[in-house]
């Protein structure tokens, strides 16, 4: 799948624009602050209904504009296309449209337009809180396991009920036991989905990483959120008093984590920033491979400021891997010469110059 048209209005400093990107490689170049990252942000908004630069959408709306809107036409792998639209106004009203119909949730967008983001904050996947790694893990499971979303919703409902009971004691013993059974059932299913996903991801990640950088002894493992030798029901029963003191459930899938270690050490503690970025790139490219194996279609990659923290050899290796995925890629850089050359002659490459919010296509992939 790929975006064949993108229209952006009212997003940060960008002038209203409609782009016809290449189905493969798209390079956006221009000075810092010109609006390159805002283009990626608009596409991210279209696919996830969230910004990767701000936890709130209000700052995304252009100054003195009533709203921001992004439309896109997605060419589907199975043929045909789908029209997506996302709009948010200053009063907080949010609208998601898919083929002319209001969508129920952002998950419907994500299913049609799977996005992967690689940017200067990518190292947070290694250094940041476990929540970031759970989001990475569950993105992958969501796109390859059709039962995941319904089970995840069951888990969240049961967990919410149990945490409410822990804080307020509003359930009788029979109701509490019923919700605990539901929580354990959903937790076991989520754990099964995640475990199967990591088993499939590990060899692809290891192969991808070996093509980017040599890091002997780097291992990827999965912690499910409770003792692997015990049933969750046993753990919950033994920790009930501590959970009541804390006011929330301390064991379960909501405490899961991915662990990357180099020998006996946490990888984030000893890898350079550039090495961390390469590890994250390998993880995200491996995810793209798995999506393409399970679904008819590819992820779309948003790569912001690719040259930063990578030398020429590693930059070329990363571009080669992205090219081999045969997916659509949007890459930003200051100088187009960093990225213009080196692609295969049969790979369609489009160039867009961004200056003070104005976007001009300087090379059409169809030429």
Swiss-Prot record:
ATP binds at residues 30-37. It comes from the Bacteria. GO terms for biological process: DNA replication; DNA synthesis involved in DNA repair; double-strand break repair; SOS response. Keywords: ATP-binding, Cytoplasm, DNA damage, DNA repair, DNA replication, DNA-binding, Nucleotide-binding, SOS response. It is found in: Cytoplasm. It holds the Pfam family SMC_N. Signal peptide: none annotated. GO terms for molecular function: ATP binding; single-stranded DNA binding. Its main location: cytoplasm. GO terms for cellular component: cytoplasm. The RecF protein is involved in DNA metabolism; it is required for DNA replication and normal SOS inducibility. RecF binds preferentially to single-stranded, linear DNA. It also seems to bind ATP. Belongs to the RecF family. This is DNA replication and repair protein RecF. It comes from Pseudomonas syringae pv. syringae (strain B728a).
